[in-house]
């Protein structure tokens, strides 16, 4: 599931085509306005990643095309960095527990997004890259589905994944979405 969340996060960045000045190398480099959106348990996992584990993760990311399934990726992670594999397993368990607390309609939307993310990832690995227009349409559809959720469903997302709510409610992000997703 962690890989699926990473795929969704990376796809979101690609979809919105927002210029990113620099990817933070350390948790402390993340702007304070975004740190507050990261659940404490996730923040602790991020802070606990060592320089060696970051290097292993970077190498695995560079070789992402070699891993056709989540299981292959996990096996490579375990071989490359057993300590990072253990940390990733704990984070995956945490995210799974949070996912299970979501309202059923929120779960359905998240499952749909994850499934599409996996599908896009497989297409990418096969050399079939989606067009920016198709990604824009996909993003617009998911944004509309999120907005159509009940207040209760949105409340469970806010409680369990505040970073997602922050993403959908942040004025700067809404401006970017308005600019790039038309």
From Swiss-Prot:
Keyword Nucleus: no
Keywords: Coiled coil, Lipid-binding, Secreted, Signal
Annotated signal peptide: 1-17
The organism's place on the tree of life at top rank: Eukaryota
This protein's GO CC annotations: extracellular region
Parts forming coiled coils: 46-73, 131-152
Location relative to the cell: Secreted
Molecular functions (GO terms): fatty acid binding; retinol binding
Family matches, as InterPro entries: Gp-FAR-1
Gene3D superfamilies per the UniProt record, alphabetical: 1.20.120.1100
Record bears the keyword Secreted: yes
Function: Probably binds lipids.
Classification via PANTHER family: FATTY-ACID AND RETINOL-BINDING PROTEIN 1, FATTY-ACID AND RETINOL-BINDING PROTEIN 1-RELATED
Family per similarity comment: Belongs to the fatty-acid and retinol-binding protein (FARBP) family.
Protein name from the UniProt record: Fatty-acid and retinol-binding protein 2
Organism encoding this protein: Caenorhabditis elegans
Gene: far-2
